[in-house]
A protein has these predicted regions:
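Protein-protein interaction/assembly regions in multi-subunit complexes
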Residues: 1-270
């Protein structure tokens, strides 16, 4: 039996939700739950900060005059930014703010190619009456990409490259409960709890994950079908070869047909 009902329930915020799939055949609740969870956490496309540059800073171990946080803390803050990038190429975002005060994602200058979903996220705290200037490079991707795998030749001198977590899903958990269908009590109900970073809704996240799985299974199904057709086909190389028709063969064939006709005519007269 295939599931006949999928229900999406809202959570405490628009980016926390629950998906309920029922009824599932015995054992398939865990199978579906674990598979969807892995895809949700690893394979959805998203965007993240890939590198940044602060005026007057040469590397991640430098001290920043007039800023409370060190570079390591700023890196951690940048990893928490939730954003959408609408182009394939990396986008450069800029910040220019005079202290004292708090620098947040809302201070990033507007860019038509980027949408900031976490405008209240803190980036740095300015403690002096100085101007803080920063460039943030954001890009699109899937899953997790460490800084070591990025080509540093693509960045200017003084740019600090960081690890990037592109997935828009922050957390996924699932549970399986028994449910009744008629007199049968061992069917299962799958409950998925999903939290995103604000750039995608839980419903869209589940739909994209299911589509990714369907695309992969379609390739497997297509490959299995092609193999089946190949087994049913007859190899032409195994067929007996036709002998070439020569003049002698054609003449013998005509004589045989003529003899048959004469014999039939004689029998008819009798």
């Amino acid at each position: 039996m295939l599931p006949s009902k999928v229900e999406f329930l809202p959570g405490e915020t628009p980016f926390i939700g629950r998906a309920v799939v029922t009824p599932c055949y015995f054992g398939y609740g865990t199978t579906l739950g674990n598979t969807l969870r892995r895809v949700l956490l690893s394979s959805l496309p998203g965007a993240a900060v890939e590198a940044f540059k602060i005026k007057g800073v040469q590397h991640e171990f430098s001290a920043i005059d007039g800023v409370k946080e060190d570079i390591v803390q700023i890196i951690l803050n940048l990893k928490q930014l939730a954003l959408k990038v609408f182009v394939d190429e990396p986008v450069v975002l800029t910040i220019s703010k005079k202290g004292p005060g708090v620098v947040t994602a809302a201070d990033i200058e507007k860019n038509a190619n980027v949408e900031i979903a976490s405008g209240d996220a803190v980036i740095a705290t300015l403690t002096a009456n100085k101007t803080f200037e920063m460039e943030i490079i954001a890009g699109r991707g899937r899953g997790y990409k460490p800084a070591e795998e990025k080509d540093r030749q693509n960045y200017d001198l003084g740019t600090i490259v960081i690890d990037s977590l592109y997935t828009p899903v922050r957390d996924v958990g699932y549970s399986v409960e028994y449910t009744r269908v008629g007199d049968i009590t061992n069917f299962e109900k799958l409950i998925l709890n999903i939290e995103t970073n604000g750039t995608i809704s839980p419903r869209d996240a589940v739909q994209q994950s299911a589509q990714i799985l369907m695309d992969h299974f379609a390739i497997v199904l297509q490959g299995a079908g092609e193999e089946k057709n190949e087994v049913g086909q007859i190899d032409e190389s195994e067929q007996p070869a036709e002998e070439p028709v020569t003049e002698e063969v054609e003449e013998a064939k005509v004589k045989k047909e003529t003899k048959v006709k004469k014999t039939a005519a004689v029998k008819k007269k009798k």
